[in-house]
Amino acid sequence: MQDSHAWSGRFSEPVSELVKHYTASIGFDYRLAEVDIEGSLAHAAMLNRSGVLSDADLEAIRRGMADILDEIRAGKLEWSVDLEDVHMNIERRLTDRIGDAGKRLHTGRSRNDQVATDIRLWLRGEIDATVHLLAGLQSSLLELAERHADTVMPGFTHLQVAQPVTFGHHLLAYVEMLARDAERMLDCRKRVNRLPLGAAALAGTTYPIDRHYTAQLLGFDDVCHNSLDAVSDRDFAIEFTAAASLAMLHLSRLSEELILWMSPRVGFIDIADRFCTGSSIMPQKKNPDVPELVRGKSGRVVGHLIALITLMKAQPLAYNKDNQEDKEPLFDTVDTLQTTLRIYADMMRGVTVKPEAMRAAVLQGYATATDLADYLVKKGLPFRDSHEVVALAVRHAEGLGVDLADLPLAKLREFSALIEDDVFGVLTPEGSLAQRDHVGGTAPAQVRAQIARHRGRLG
């Protein structure tokens, strides 16, 4: 039986069945089918414009590709392992439909520059979709932050109560992180959006091609200017996966906090039932499975980043078969991040906040101690001295089991004669918040201003 591979003429025996399945990529690169067709149509148009492909052949290719695209979208195209990959499957189907015109499509092109183009086309679209999803999650967080711009909660360092903040301010920290994630994605897109097609196998082609015309047809900003680099590097995929890893790390941090806040010992929030599961043995359990799984999946995406870096670290120029291993980590990174963003945007809308529990935690942690120290500094006491005075006052209040604001003025004055009755304006959580009325501060007015700024940015 004649070997079905496009390169079989060089070999004296067919490839073994085990090797055939080991080296085939059609099991996963079929996802590139639509962009592969898009790239092929642009390549054909360029060949026609350059006089390499006749008008009749171009029209036949366009008709054939349209039919194949319909088959793919209807799930009717049968992918063959014998044909190795998505490129050869589509080319064989095209040739079966239109004859010799299909065989001419690959003129001036190699699978090396073809696959590099496909991945860039596909990833460009996925970056745009990811940026949109990041904006959706930011909007969900902004809605929740606006409802709780005045809701007092403890800010933490070392997981110990530190100073009062608002829940809205806390959520805006994650909006800032996600905004940077989107910026990284868009910056990465600039380097993704360069055309490898025309580099051929590694050295370019002898045909009179017009790479800039192909780039224009496909919406690329520029061409890759070195043929060796164009076909061999996957740094753009690594860069995207690094940006995706950071986004997942940010979501993992938020997940950790949601898990803590939902625990009965903290009780700051509740997550809607549709995002939780129960226990097969403990009837009372309501488990925050989504945040826990997001926390776990962040490691999955970081693992893909390490896999891609390791894949590229020792490859000589130019293309090597190693690069076939770039797709599954990249595909799964996109799938994991996008699914997580979709779920998270919905989940954050279903978060129930418990302001009383948050405020009680502030009062239990001497969160206004720094405010008392600042108060004394403004009265003329050096900060290191005020720090010592307040530490003694906290120790005394802690011994009584009361908050600083509950100590009588006379007792407070025993620690410093500079303390007067206006001190109680800074010892309440609300008083503490009100004093931090500057850009980036946690005063409710500043929280609302930042929400407005972010909404203006998102449009």
Swiss-Prot record:
CDD domains: Argininosuccinate_lyase. It comes from the Bacteria. InterPro entries: Arg_succ_lyase_C (IPR029419), Argininosuccinate_lyase (IPR009049), Fumarase/histidase_N (IPR024083), Fumarate_lyase_CS (IPR020557), Fumarate_lyase_fam (IPR000362), Fumarate_lyase_N (IPR022761), L-Aspartase-like (IPR008948). One of its GO terms (biological process) is arginine biosynthetic process via ornithine. One of its GO terms (cellular component) is cytosol. It holds the Pfam family Lyase_1. Pathway: Amino-acid biosynthesis; L-arginine biosynthesis; L-arginine from L-ornithine and carbamoyl phosphate: step 3/3. It is an enzyme of class 4 (lyase). NCBIfam families: argH. This is Argininosuccinate lyase. The lineage of its organism: Bacteria, Pseudomonadati, Pseudomonadota, Betaproteobacteria, Neisseriales.
